[in-house]
């Protein structure tokens, strides 16, 4: 049994990226367990908190550590990573020497109703996650532009192909 953790970078209750992630996760094989990591209540990271047991921090670190892979679905805020998503990345690298991203398989999906499809956030995520030692899925890259909740056949097929590649990659431990 493989465990895939899902992190949605949007805090919106009607998140387009959550919808996209759900379409991908529908393709998960039966032997893959999906566990969403809720980032909505995480206090902002501060090094001053490294020596304090903060249950929200501990939970997130353990969920990432326990997963075989992480799927991140995120919008783009002001041409970069949403603050809540960057916060969880930072939390999971600390305290020093306890980086749970190290060698973790991570796939990135970004979507936006705009013309750029979240590519700036996707590239920044790739840069940050590579820096913290994650193994980021190289291909296929997913930057969905002009995205909406009503996915056309071409987009649906592309997401299915991405899902197939992602879950094969997860299974090759």
Region locations from a protein language model:
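Secondary-structure boundary/capping motif
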Residues: 13-16, 45, 80-81, 117-118
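A general structural signal for well-ordered alpha-helical segments in protein cores
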Residues: 17, 21, 57, 85, ...
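Glycine-rich phosphate/pyrophosphate-binding loop and the adjoining helix
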Residues: 135-173
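A generic structural motif
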Residues: 29-35, 134-135
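N-terminal beta-loop-helix "entrance" segment that forms/cooperates
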Residues: 39-55, 148
């Amino acid at each position: 049994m493989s465990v895939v953790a899902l992190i949605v970078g949007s805090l919106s209750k009607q998140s387009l990226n959550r919808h996209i992630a759900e379409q991908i996760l529908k393709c998960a094989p039966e032997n893959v367990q999906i566990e969403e990591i809720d980032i909505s209540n995480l206090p902002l990271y501060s090094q001053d908190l490294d020596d304090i047991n903060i249950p929200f921090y501990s939970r997130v670190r353990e969920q990432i550590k326990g997963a075989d892979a992480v799927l991140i679905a995120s919008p783009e805020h002001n041409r970069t990573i949403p603050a809540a998503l960057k916060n969880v990345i930072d939390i999971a690298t600390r305290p020093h020497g306890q980086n749970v991203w190290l060698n973790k398989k991570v796939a990135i999906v970004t979507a936006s109703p705009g013309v750029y499809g979240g590519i700036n956030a996707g590239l920044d995520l790739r840069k940050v996650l590579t820096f913290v030692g994650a193994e980021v899925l190289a291909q296929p890259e997913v930057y969905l532009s002009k995205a909406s909740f009503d996915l056309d056949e071409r987009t649906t097929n592309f997401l299915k192909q991405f899902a197939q590649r992602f879950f094969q990659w997860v299974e090759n431990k």
